[in-house]
């Protein structure tokens, strides 16, 4: 009996060893990242910056920018930053990350799966599940940095990634505080339209069209893509003009961004149509949420209804005279002092 037990234990140890080797292999990134500073904002002299790579639990390699306060000592609080939806880390999320690093936090801005410099095929597809996982994978990475306190990690989600950050925080109890800035709930807007205006008949028709597109994609062996984003043709709503003025001008244009004249796959909405991401927002409590939104933003109702659905502690901070896109890059309007106070108080 003892001999058999020893053999069993030996086999178990060998299996664990093989599993560990597989895990090490799994964790090896293989992306080629640009070395040049190609952000839409000026590089700070107060912060050290480097490109990094890590994998999410689906095996997709993510590209990110790590920002560390210069001359930092000891274990520091950390913040992972994602968004806006269809943007890259060289845009708004990088600006937020660098600015918060100037204020004493180790920060990480990342490209979501299938976009920017991150891996994943086909290109330019989004998923409420995988993109929520991207946030938690960023927590994995930043929490393993030698200068980061694993018990003091927060999140910032911008635009459509505000909803993703809330979803990730609900499920990932390692996150101690979360900010949703100028947020969208992408599952709500894709399934119900702006201001919940889509009728059941319209929803059914959309799903039928998406099903038909799947037949075409399967037949062709490659996904079809939507029309280029943020190209104005005339007669657009003001918020669409605002998007153009950020993504398609020197203010915020970046060639790798979906929103800068590229496009999502036609079938990207499918999983968003049937997977509401804020179902468990109450489970973020007792960890705090800060919602930040512009007074004049077309999207303000997303933060207001999410705020009502969330449990305490929570706060909704309205930025006077700001529209949706202003909170992407207008450093005179983004309430960085408010964000700093929030994370300083709650990541301690």
Which positions does each model-derived feature cover?
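Short beta-strand/loop motif that positions the catalytic acidic residue
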Residues: 284, 291-293
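Short beta-strand element of the alpha/beta-hydrolase
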Residues: 75-84
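The serine-hydrolase catalytic nucleophile loop
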Residues: 86-98, 112
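Alpha/beta-hydrolase-fold enzymes
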Residues: 166-246
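N-terminal cap/lid segment of alpha/beta-hydrolase-fold proteins
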Residues: 30-74, 328
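Conserved alpha/beta-hydrolase
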Residues: 99-119
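Catalytic histidine-centered segment of alpha/beta-hydrolase-like enzymes
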Residues: 322-333
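Alpha/beta-hydrolase active-site loop
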Residues: 125-146
């Amino acid at each position: 009996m003892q001999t058999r037990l020893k053999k069993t234990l030996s086999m178990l140890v060998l299996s664990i060893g093989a599993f560990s080797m597989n895990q090490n292999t799994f964790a090896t990134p293989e992306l080629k990242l640009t070395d040049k500073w190609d952000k839409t904002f000026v590089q700070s002299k107060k912060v050290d910056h480097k490109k990094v790579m890590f994998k999410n639990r689906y095996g997709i390699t993510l590209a990110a920018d790590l920002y560390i306060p210069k001359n930092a000592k000891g274990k520091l609080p950390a913040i992972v930053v994602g968004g806006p939806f269809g943007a890259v880390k060289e845009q708004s999320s990088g600006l937020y990350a660098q600015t918060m690093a100037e204020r004493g936090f180790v920060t990480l801005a990342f490209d979501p799966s299938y976009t920017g410099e991150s891996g994943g095929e086909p290109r330019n597809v989004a998923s409420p599940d995988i993109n929520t996982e991207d946030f938690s994978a960023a927590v994995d990475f930043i929490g393993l940095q030698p200068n980061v306190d694993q018990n003091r990690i927060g999140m910032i989600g911008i635009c459509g990634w505000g909803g993703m950050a809330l979803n990730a925080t609900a499920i990932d109890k390692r996150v101690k505080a979360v900010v949703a800035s100028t947020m969208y709930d992408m599952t709500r807007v894709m399934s119900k339209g702006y201001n919940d205006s889509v009728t059941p008949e319209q929803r059914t028709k959309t799903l039928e069209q998406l099903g038909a597109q799947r037949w075409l994609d399967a037949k062709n062996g490659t996904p079809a893509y939507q029309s280029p984003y943020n190209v104005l043709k005339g007669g657009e709503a003001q918020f669409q003009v605002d998007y153009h003025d950020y993504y398609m001008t020197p203010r915020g244009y970046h060639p790798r961004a979906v929103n800068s004249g590229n496009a999502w796959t036609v079938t990207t909405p499918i999983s968003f149509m049937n997977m509401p991401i804020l179902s468990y927002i109450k489970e973020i409590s007792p960890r705090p949420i800060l919602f930040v939104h512009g007074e004049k933003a077309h999207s303000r109702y997303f933060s207001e209804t999410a705020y009502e659905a969330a449990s305490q502690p929570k706060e909704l901070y309205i930025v006077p005279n700001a529209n949706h896109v202003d909170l992407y890059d207008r450093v005179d309007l983004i309430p960085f002092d408010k964000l700093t106070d929030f994370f300083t108080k709650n990541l301690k």
